[in-house]
Amino acid sequence: MMDALYFDSLTLFHDPALRLLYHRWRGTYNSHLFQPAVQHVQQLLGQLRIEYWIADLNGLPNLGLEDQFLISEQVLPQVARMPHLRQLALVLSSNVYNQLAVESILHLGNEHLRFDVQYFSDAASAFDWLINPTDAPATAAPSMAAGLVA
């Protein structure tokens, strides 16, 4: 059963039995809201020993350069060291700017990642990949650069 967690600018759900965390941005965006939200998610990942993480980027306006730097230089290296994290499902919106920003961030940090990352066009496919593991994620979006599968 999913528990709703609360944070000002995020919709958060946690399933303790699956060790799964889902989050999606809500509301307006600025660095003063984004950075504490990212830090809160990072704290939950460690505190709750999350193994399966869904980051839904729908609703997130264009990421500022300062926030991209924060994620790539501080957050991602710390998250990469979490031994319990197994899979990250990124649900991408149709916002091409954010798709490219995420691709760039993960490309730079890819050498440090110890968990699987897949991109999806919808949350249902992301949940399916996490809770029904297979060798080849058939519902994953093939490439961010090629766009999203509807």
Language-model features and meaning:
Residues M2-A150:
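Amphipathic, Lys/Arg-enriched alpha-helical "gate/interface" segment within cytosolic domains
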